[in-house]
Amino acid sequence: MDSSSKAMNGSAGGSPVGDDRKMGDHEHEFRISIILLRSFLLVLVIISEALMVTDRETGSVPLPFFGLPRPVFVTKTAKYELVTGLKFYVDALGVVIGYTVLHLLFNIGLVATKGTVVDCKSVAWISFIADSMMGYLLLSGAAVATEIGYLAEEGAPAVLWRKVCNAFGYFCTVYAISVVICFIAALVSFVVVGISAYHLFRLYGIQQQAAREKEKLSAEM
């Protein structure tokens, strides 16, 4: 009777030993993989943000005036602050950077102290939802920047929007690199979301298995 109780307590209950060990090993592997992925994601987003924020070029833009044989050239400096959509792009990257740094510190702290939150499904749910939001934020920011870049490259003759990349070639090149890196970061972020989802539902599987083992031991007693 006593040995059965010990076995049952070891497989299920408030602090199951065997289950904790299995979940703890999985938790450690999960934390290491997620730290590496988040670090890579952080580098990508920082590079994308730095490229856009520091991107500057001064050039001459032709302004046609009716009655004049030639357009008047005006000196302008191309920068992201001039376009509201690009401000959203930069702000979105900043939010993702802040979130990723906080999450990295949290995971590094858990690994360093050998802490665990495997029994707290609410934390796993919050992480999964927040990761998903960051992924969609990156994707939406990159989509907005792509549309603006297309208009800058091709113009919109129907509404008399002129091409600007012919006057700001360097700016548009750096701009394009930033957006491409942002799309890559979005893909990496969705890989992180996939790992978070796997970890979350793995917790349910392990706990359900522990419950079945407890019921089996109870039936044998």
Curated annotation (Swiss-Prot):
Alphabetical list of PANTHER family matching this protein: CASP-LIKE PROTEIN 2C1-RELATED, CASP-LIKE PROTEIN 4A4
Extracellular side: 53-91, 144-174
Complexes and interactors: Homodimer and heterodimers.
Topology with respect to the bilayer: Multi-pass membrane protein
Family note: Belongs to the Casparian strip membrane proteins (CASP) family.
Region: Disordered, residue numbers: 1-22
Signal peptide start-end: none
Protein name (record): CASP-like protein 2U11
Organism: Selaginella moellendorffii (Spikemoss)
Residues passing through the membrane, by range: 32-52, 92-112, 123-143, 175-195
UniProt KW keywords: Cell membrane, Membrane, Transmembrane, Transmembrane helix
InterPro entries listed in its UniProt record: CASP/CASPL, CASP_dom
GO CC field: plasma membrane
Cytoplasmic topological domain: 1-31, 113-122, 196-221
Record Pfam families: CASP_dom
Cellular compartment(s): Cell membrane
